[in-house]
Structures are given as structure tokens and as C-alpha cells.
From Swiss-Prot:
CDD domains recorded: IGPD
Any one GO molecular function term: imidazoleglycerol-phosphate dehydratase activity
Catalytic activity field: D-erythro-1-(imidazol-4-yl)glycerol 3-phosphate = 3-(imidazol-4-yl)-2-oxopropyl phosphate + H2O
Top-level EC class: lyase
Family: Belongs to the imidazoleglycerol-phosphate dehydratase family.
Key word Amino-acid biosynthesis present: yes
Species of origin: Xanthobacter autotrophicus (strain ATCC BAA-1158 / Py2)
GO cellular component, one term: cytoplasm
EC number: 4.2.1.19
PANTHER family given in the database record: IMIDAZOLEGLYCEROL-PHOSPHATE DEHYDRATASE (PTHR23133:SF2), IMIDAZOLEGLYCEROL-PHOSPHATE DEHYDRATASE HIS7 (PTHR23133)
Coiled-coil residue windows: none
GO biological process: L-histidine biosynthetic process
Protein name per the record: Imidazoleglycerol-phosphate dehydratase
Gene3D superfamilies: Imidazole glycerol phosphate dehydratase, domain 1
Length: 197
């Protein structure tokens, strides 16, 4: 079973997360940030991960610490659930439309953390959520998961649609890249014989 439970506690936040990579897309998300909950719910749905997150953070300061730390813990959980990554597809990419918006996302579960994020927002906030925190989440996730992740919005107008296309794109590439490749026969998908070393 490809599952992981992580609890991370700092002076700023406490995040408890459970993920099942072979789930059905069920989620129970409570971060105290409505927009982030919405994005994580749709990520679970479209990745087909079962995902539970309970986060308590210093929201009286702002949403930065909670958003970043949820990204960190989700990345840690993905890495733990994948183990030695034997038999996974490893690579995936998608062009994800959301009404007037089109975003391209590409993923390599390589063990080498790197993010390219070419997405711009014309407004500073979506409701109470700072749009710059979308990038912070993706950076935290890529770094802690040890993945190479490229996110590029080719065009778009509505900030909510742009953010949603990024999260749905991440969901779809995760779903494809963690899938077990029957042709791989349990091999580690690397000529080095190991990932992340």
C-alpha cells in the first residue's frame, strides 16, 4: 500500500497529513484557508489520491506559513509513500484548460528538487488569498518531494481560473507519474538504478 502519514509541528504551524496514492479521490481538508482547501480538494480529486489534511497555523499573521508548510508536508508524504519509486511511470505532462486559461505542467519524479514557475496573476488576491502564495506552495512541494516540476500558464485572465489550472495540472501529472508501469516489472525507472541519489 502506497500510503504515508506525516505530522510536522513548528512554532508557526502544525500540519497533520495522510495520503493514499492508490485511492479514489476522497478528501477531508481543513487548513483554515478556504481557497487553499478548495485547491487541495480538487488536487485530491483529480490525482485520485485519498487525502486528509488538518492544519493549524498563525493565520492572524497571514496565510504564508500555513500555505508553505502544507506544501512541504504534502511533498514529504508523497516521497514517503513512493518509497524507492520502483515501478512508477516517473514522467508526466499535461495541457490543462480552465475556461479561458491554458496551463502546461510537466513533472519528473527524479529525486532532484527543482521548480520552474511561469505563471502571472493580474491581481494580488483571490478573495483573501495572496496570489503569490500559489508559487510558494508549488516551491515548497517540489523541494520537499524531490521532484522536478515545470508550471507555465500560456494564457489566462481570471486569477481563480489560473490558480485552479495550476493545481489541476499538478494533480493530473501526479496521477500519471506515480502510476505503476506494468512494463517496468518493478524496476527503478533510472539508468543509475536509483532515484534521488
Amino acid at each position: 500500500m502506497r500510503k504515508a502519514d506525516i505530522v510536522r509541528e513548528t512554532k508557526e504551524t502544525r500540519v497533520a497529513l495522510t495520503v493514499d496514492l492508490d485511492g479514489t479521490g476522497r478528501s477531508a481538508i481543513s487548513t483554515g484557508i478556504g481557497f487553499l482547501d478548495h485547491m487541495l480538494d480538487l488536487l485530491a480529486r483529480h490525482a485520485r489520491f485519498d487525502l486528509e489534511i488538518k492544519a493549524d497555523g498563525d493565520l492572524h499573521v497571514d496565510f504564508h506559513h500555513t500555505t508553505e508548510d502544507v506544501g512541504i508536508v504534502l511533498g514529504q508524504a508523497l516521497k514517503k509513500a513512493l518509497g524507492d519509486m520502483r515501478g512508477i511511470t516517473r514522467y508526466a505532462d499535461v495541457l490543462l484548460p480552465m475556461d479561458e486559461t491554458l496551463t502546461r505542467v510537466a513533472l519528473d519524479i527524479s529525486g532532484r528538487p527543482f521548480l520552474v514557475f511561469r505563471t502571472e496573476f493580474a491581481v494580488p488576491k483571490i478573495g483573501e488569498f495572496d496570489t503569490e502564495l500559489v508559487r510558494e506552495f508549488f516551491q515548497a512541494f517540489a523541494s520537499s518531494a524531490g521532484v522536478t516540476l515545470h508550471v507555465e500558464t500560456l494564457y489566462g485572465v481570471n486569477a481563480h481560473h489560473i490558480a485552479e489550472s495550476c493545481f489541476k495540472g499538478l494533480a493530473r501529472v501526479l496521477r500519471a507519474a506515480v502510476a505503476v508501469d506494468p512494463a517496468a516489472a518493478g524496476e527503478i525507472p533510472s539508468t543509475k538504478g536509483a532515484l534521488g541519489t
